[in-house]
């Protein structure tokens, strides 16, 4: 008798639990978490699919879920001719993806010196690591004020961030973890660059003009009080580095904590 053939499994396979599409260019998905995976909120892993030749095609993706979560969440762009995202955007519940359980990254609390206020500057899907950090209780223990800025071209591209903030502030699990008073530390500042909205403009321009600080009632940014994390396009990373260093902040790393950090692996 022939033994039934086993279903082939991918190396480092994880199962898709949920997929949510926001626009024709943006979607998020959740997968099972390997039992052995330990990570710090803000880190990224390599995920992907098998190519037709049987070799894995992997890209760096920030984990959007916090370190305490049983599931892993990711937030992605869809690039129609992109080697990976052209296929990844079609995944559905029950499918398998490859996930290499070796997390790394610079957007972690360990890379920053203690401060009073933390700025999380994101464009597009660069909000993903901050979705993890904003659901991490340590963030609320370490800082008196937590400011998330999220800039997208169109208003509907802000939906993921809007849902995230709503989930955090609705008095559910996060208020149990950190207390309702701590959640009042969180300020959300979304901006658009193309669609009309309440706040328009690039965050770099709003910082340089002083409008951002004025809107938030903040006198200034200094290395004594302020810490920052930056995740977005290459242009944003470069421009914000100059602006933050103009305020006297120095770039930090896991090995040498300082005042701000930039995720170099992410560009999108």
Show the residue positions of the predicted features.
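Ser/Thr-glycine-rich phosphate-binding loops at phosphate-binding pockets of nucleotides
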Residues: 123-128
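Conserved S-adenosyl-L-methionine
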Residues: 115, 140-144
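Ferredoxin-reductase
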Residues: 2-95
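Short helix-loop-beta connector
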Residues: 112-117, 223-224
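Reductase modules of NAD(P)H-dependent flavoproteins
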Residues: 6-12, 149, 156-268
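A short, basic/flexible loop-to-alpha-helix module at the beginning of a structural domain
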Residues: 103-113
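Conserved beta-strand elements of the Class I
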Residues: 118-121, 229
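Histidine-anchored nucleotide/phosphate-binding helix
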Residues: 129-139
């Amino acid at each position: 008798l022939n033994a039934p053939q086993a279903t082939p499994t991918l190396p480092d396979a994880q199962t898709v639990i949920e997929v949510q599409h926001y626009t024709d260019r943006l979607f998020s998905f959740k997968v099972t978490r390997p039992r052995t995976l330990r990570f710090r909120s803000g880190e990224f892993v390599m995920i992907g699919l098998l190519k037709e030749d049987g070799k894995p095609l992997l890209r760096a993706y920030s984990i959007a879920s916090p370190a305490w979560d049983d599931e892993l969440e990711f937030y992605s762009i869809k690039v129609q001719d992109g080697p990976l995202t052209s296929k990844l955007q079609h995944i559905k519940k029950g499918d398998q993806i490859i996930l290499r359980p070796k997390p790394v990254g610079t957007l972690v609390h360990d890379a920053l010196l203690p401060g009073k206020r933390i700025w999380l500057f994101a464009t597009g899907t660069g909000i993903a690591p901050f979705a993890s950090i904003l659901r991490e209780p340590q963030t609320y223990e370490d800082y008196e004020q937590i400011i998330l800025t999220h800039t997208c071209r169109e208003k509907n591209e802000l939906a993921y961030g809007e849902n995230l903030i709503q989930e955090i502030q609705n008095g559910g699990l996060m208020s149990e973890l950190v207390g309702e008073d701590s959640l009042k530390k969180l300020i959300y500042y979304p901006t658009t660059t193309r669609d009309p909205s309440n706040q328009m403009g690039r965050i770099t321009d709003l910082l340089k003009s002083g409008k951002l600080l004025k809107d938030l009632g903040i006198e200034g940014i200094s290395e004594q009080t302020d810490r920052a994390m930056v995740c977005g396009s290459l242009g944003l990373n470069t421009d914000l580095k100059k602006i933050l260093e103009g305020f006297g902040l120095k770039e930090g790393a896991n090995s040498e904590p300082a005042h701000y950090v930039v995720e170099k692996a992410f560009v999108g």
